[in-house]
Regions:
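Membrane-embedded alpha-helical bundles of multi-pass transporters/translocases
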Residues: 1-213
Length: 213
């Protein structure tokens, strides 16, 4: 029954993409080979921890917008952040801004997952189907783990194809460019895909609004 719901697939793909980006773990490569100082990664990580403020903002936004509308808006902001990362080079100011904006992208799919499950379950129940909250959560968690694994696999494969060699002190230009692409462009593209997943929820959002009146 869960597999027949397009909404569980859309939500699960959003979770998988968010975890894929996290699983890529390109930051260490970027700050070692592009910035030239791995120690500066900790500074950027410190600023991205500010995204916990979203936990305060989300409840306010959810009073006016649906979870998926919030997810779409945050994903657009995140994609801008990732694009900044691609063009930032070794500019720490831009890297901090880009990383902070990018860190917001996957928060709705990961931290508001239970709300999404409840919305889908309510829809199932109204259409004479089993609510299946536990099944919905399990599908999301499973695809999320697949996303994390794919992120790591993809980075390893693309870096190898670009000529990256961990034994070299200076990487070839092709490897440096690939690291920049993986740190900026690839996450931006995947984040835009989560926007499309959120847009696919419009009929369900409309149904939810009509049934809350």
């Amino acid at each position: 029954m869960a597999m027949k719901s397009r909404y569980i697939w859309l939500a699960s793909i959003g979770v998988a993409i968010s975890n894929l980006i996290i699983g890529m773990g390109v930051g260490s490569y970027y700050f070692t080979d592009v910035v030239g100082d791995i120690a500066k990664l900790s500074m950027v990580t410190m600023f991205t921890s500010l995204n916990v403020l979203a936990m305060v903002i989300f409840p306010v936004l959810l009073k006016r917008y649906s979870v998926m509308q919030v997810a779409a808006g945050v994903a657009v902001v995140g994609s801008v952040g990732y694009l900044i990362n691609f063009f930032a080079g070794a500019n720490m100011g831009l890297l901090i801004i880009g990383a902070l904006l990018g860190s917001f992208a996957g928060l709705p799919f990961n931290y508001l997952r239970s709300v999404i499950c409840m919305q889908i379950a309510d829809y199932n129940e109204a259409n004479n189907m089993v609510r299946m909250e536990a099944t919905l959560a399990a599908v999301m968690n499973f695809l999320g783990k697949i996303g994390s694994a794919l992120g790591s696999f993809m980075v390893g494969g693309l870096l190898s194809m670009s000529g990256y060699n961990g034994a070299l002190e200076v990487q070839p230009d092709s490897a440096i460019f690939m690291i920049r692409v993986l740190y900026g462009l690839v996450p931006a593209i995947f984040t835009i895909l989560t926007v499309l997943c959120a847009v696919g929820f419009r009929p369900l959002d409309k149904w939810t609004r009509e049934n809350e009146k």
